[in-house]
């Protein structure tokens, strides 16, 4: 089980990413396609944005336990929680494989 502070940190990062997404995208577009002087200025502004507003810094975590590894994107939980919930029949449409 992850510490509550780690879960809170990820939530805080997600909020920052959402808040600065449009501004970051606009600046990156200028850096890619603008004139060199404008591109340099946009790059400087991009560096002034908060470090945690970069989506690369976000990490997928299990919604139930906060576990960072073994994350299954389709369900948003870790492999351990997935197995436990599937065994108990808590995930609709999931059953053990047999062939």
Swiss-Prot record:
Species lineage: Bacteria, Pseudomonadati, Bacteroidota, Bacteroidia, Bacteroidales
Cystines in this chain: none
Listed name of the protein: Small ribosomal subunit protein uS14
Domain of life: Bacteria
InterPro entries (UniProt xref): Ribosomal_uS14 (IPR001209), Ribosomal_uS14_bac/plastid (IPR023036), Ribosomal_uS14_CS (IPR018271)
Similarity remark: Belongs to the universal ribosomal protein uS14 family.
GO MF term set: rRNA binding; structural constituent of ribosome
Keywords for this protein: Ribonucleoprotein, Ribosomal protein, RNA-binding, rRNA-binding
